[in-house]
UniProtKB/Swiss-Prot annotation:
This is Beta-glucanase. It comes from Paenibacillus macerans. InterPro entries: Beta-glucanase/XTH, Beta_glucanase, ConA-like_dom_sf, GH16, GH16_AS. Residues 1-23 form the signal peptide. Disulfide bonds join 55-84.
Length: 237
């Protein structure tokens, strides 16, 4: 009887421990970007965002390397016609810590990014939080956000290294009263005004711009260009 009670106690403890760990693990979404996980991700295909985007999203420009990295490509299908790449989550996510290991593309007139987004196409207001690399100078990173379509919160940070030369970890902690951006675990910028609140998709893309030379520089048509991503992690509150 004593042995049975002891066994029951140990079993109950083990179950409780497993349950606790599982509950904790359930708040964390981490994915190595080594293959196309169709249950979690989707590829943009066959359309253009228009506006400042001077390219068409193509699923064929979203690929995976032999060493297990997501590779987004910017290519040319014909003279002055460009194809770009976007990879995005099928689910939406809210407040929490968003992290990515990535290596942006380097060239004037282009953007490599990691961000959250939702908008009218999803039946919501336009809320967005950005980590963007302007290819004209990959020794810097730009942070920004939109709340109900209102942006203008750009903050450009000098990194002290060329981001296009290797993988680094970039992150933002999104909370009801603030957004904090990090580079390799070091806090770089904090915003507290008019913080977005609508859950959105996790997105990564590479594209070339038009009509925004003062921001991106003039795109010279160079291609193919590639941005690479190693892993993505989301930790909810």
């Amino acid at each position: 009887m004593k042995k049975k009670s002891c066994f029951t106690l140990v079993t109950t403890f083990a179950f409780s421990l497993i349950f606790s760990v599982s509950a904790l693990a359930g708040s964390v979404f981490w994915e190595p970007l080594s293959y196309f996980n169709r249950s979690t991700w989707e590829k943009a295909d066959g359309y253009s965002n228009g506006g400042v985007f001077n390219c068409t999203w193509r699923a064929n420009n979203v690929n995976f390397t032999n060493d297990g990295k997501l590779k987004l490509g910017l290519t040319s299908s014909a003279y002055n016609k460009f194809d770009c790449a976007e990879y995005r989550s099928t689910n939406i996510y809210g407040y929490g810590l968003y992290e990515v290991s990535m290596k942006p593309a380097k060239n004037t007139g282009i953007v490599s990014s990691f961000f959250t987004y939702t908008g009218p196409a999803h039946g919501t207001q336009w809320d967005e939080i950005d980590i963007e690399f302007l290819g004209k100078d990959t020794t810097k990173v730009q942070f920004n956000y939109y709340t109900n379509g209102v942006g203008g919160h750009e903050k450009v940070i000098s990194l002290g290294f060329d981001a296009s030369k290797g993988f680094h970890t970039y992150a933002f902690d999104w909370q009801p009263g603030y957004i904090k951006w990090y580079v390799d675990g070091v806090l770089k910028h904090t915003a507290t005004a008019n913080i977005p609140s609508t859950p959105g998709k996790i997105m990564m893309n590479l594209w070339n711009g038009t009509g925004v030379d003062d921001w991106l520089g003039s795109y010279n048509g160079a291609n193919p260009l590639y941005a690479e991503y190693d892993w993505v992690k989301y930790t909810s509150n």
